[in-house]
Design a protein with these regions (language model features):
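Conserved acidic donor-binding segment of nucleotide-sugar-dependent glycosyltransferases
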Residues: 333-348, 357-362
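Short alpha-helical donor nucleotide-sugar binding micro-motif in glycosyltransferases
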Residues: 276-277, 284-289
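Acidic anion/phosphate-binding donor-loop and adjacent secondary structure
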Residues: 176-179, 185-208, 281-284, 399
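Nucleotide-activated donor-binding/catalytic signature segment of Leloir-type glycosyltransferases, i.e.
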Residues: 257-277
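Conserved donor-binding/catalytic core segment of Leloir-type glycosyltransferases
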Residues: 202-221, 227-232
């Protein structure tokens, strides 16, 4: 019997994202006769209350720990200090390896944190800066919070490397980088796949505009750029006055900042804030929109891109967060002018041009929609993803049993 603990108490506590993945993987693995699985985290919004308490974890014996958030490293660190022959699997949903590899200044600062963390717990400082940034409208404060958060994540990754048994990449770029810089035998590439709820359904289509789905925060999601892009599109095409061009689904610390920005730019009739939507309503919104839009500064994968394509929706995104999903043949999440359109990062001109093209050209949308759906159906399967984790855990448990 292989005993697995899935830890999901970090930065993905809301419905969707890693929390949904972890809970569904837990249910899948629990049906396997050779698996005994427990899950720790906050899943109430998904209709499940975990019976595993943090204080009970350390007394139990698990063969494998699975981490989905870098901020759960302290839990795994303490557990492994108390038990032998434990394999730790880290799923890099936050693209921490990429930040670590390409940010030497942040690595130096993270080492400085290492010198003082025995006296000052960095997690408290991280939480405090997050709260300050969420109450501020200053771009400087938000940028400082973003920088501090990455430094803290890099420090946690340094600590994780001392006991990590397996690194799981969720895009092909991560996998290539991991094989270059990590001294690990177990490096796996297991892409995120959309859940079964995301599919084509019949709806009364009455909206050809864009849909944004995600957190309402500036440091990563860059929603202010999207609002400015819609403003520019409207300004250049007078026939769009009064038209609904963008629907925003999601919640987050910068929500009021974005609403004030929309009001200041006179876009109240063009941009709608729909708030949080549960899966059933979200699938309807995907199926009713013309295209999905993203302006993120970075994405480790971009789950919403594949969710949209599974619903037959093309995607507009920038070249910075369009991740590689396969090397041979070379394929990106979005293939420009095949499954969506890709604009140059931070170019309002290019964004506005491509936004208008997707909004105004129904034939273009139809062609991209057909291709996007075919690509998503052929490339991504939640069953294959879960089966890969099952096989990985069996392999790791076998290696642990054979080690001296």
């Amino acid at each position: 019997m292989i005993k697995v603990l899935i830890i999901e108490s970090g930065s993905f506590k809301n419905i969707g994202g890693a929390a949904k993945d972890s809970l569904e993987l837990y249910k899948y693995l629990s049906k396997k006769p050779d698996m005994q699985v427990e899950i720790y985290g906050s899943f109430e919004e998904l209709g499940y209350k975990s019976r595993t308490r943090l204080d009970s974890i350390y007394a139990k014996k698990f063969d494998i720990l699975m981490l989905n958030s870098i901020r759960d490293v302290p839990i795994a660190e303490k557990y492994i200090s108390l038990h032998e022959k434990v394999a730790c699997v880290y799923v890099d949903r936050g693209d921490v390896l990429t930040h670590h590899a390409h940010a030497p200044a942040k690595r130096l600062l993270s080492k400085a944190i290492g010198l003082i963390e025995s006296r000052i717990e960095p997690s408290r400082l991280d939480k405090a800066t997050t709260e300050i940034a969420s109450r501020s409208e200053s771009k400087l404060v938000k940028a400082a919070r973003n920088y501090a958060s990455k430094v803290y994540a890099i420090r946690l990754f340094e600590r994780l490397k001392k006991f990590m048994s397996c690194y799981v990449a969720i895009n092909a770029e991560q996998a290539l980088l991991a094989r270059k810089v990590l001294k690990l035998k177990a490096i796996e590439y297991i892409p995120i796949a959309p859940h079964k709820e995301f599919r084509k359904i019949k709806v009364k289509k009455d909206y050809a505009g864009a849909l944004y789905v995600g957190r309402l925060e500036e440091t990563q999601k860059n929603v202010s750029f999207m609002i400015k892009g819609v403003y520019r599109t409207k300004k250049e095409h007078k026939e769009l006055a009064g038209k609904e061009l963008l629907r925003i689904i999601g919640e987050g610390p910068d929500e009021q900042y974005y609403k004030a920005m929309v009001s200041r730019l006179g876009l109240q009739s063009n941009i709608s804030f729909l708030g949080f939507k549960a899966y059933g309503e979200l699938v309807k919104q995907y199926n009713n929109c013309g295209f999905l839009v993203s302006c993120s500064r970075w994405e480790s994968f971009g789950r919403v891109f594949i969710e949209a394509m599974m619903c037959g929706v093309p995607v507009l995104l920038n070249d910075r967060n369009n991740k590689l999903v396969s090397v041979e043949p070379e394929r990106y999440v979005v293939q420009d002018r095949v499954t969506g359109l890709v604009y140059h990062y931070n170019s309002l001109r290019d964004f506005a041009d491509k936004f208008y093209a997707l909004y105004s050209d129904s034939k273009l949308r139809a062609r991209l929609s057909k291709n996007a759906y075919a690509f998503a159906k052929s490339k991504f399967s939640i069953e294959r993803t879960y089966e890969k984790y099952y096989k990985l855990f069996k392999d790791l448990a076998s290696r642990q049993a054979q080690s001296p």
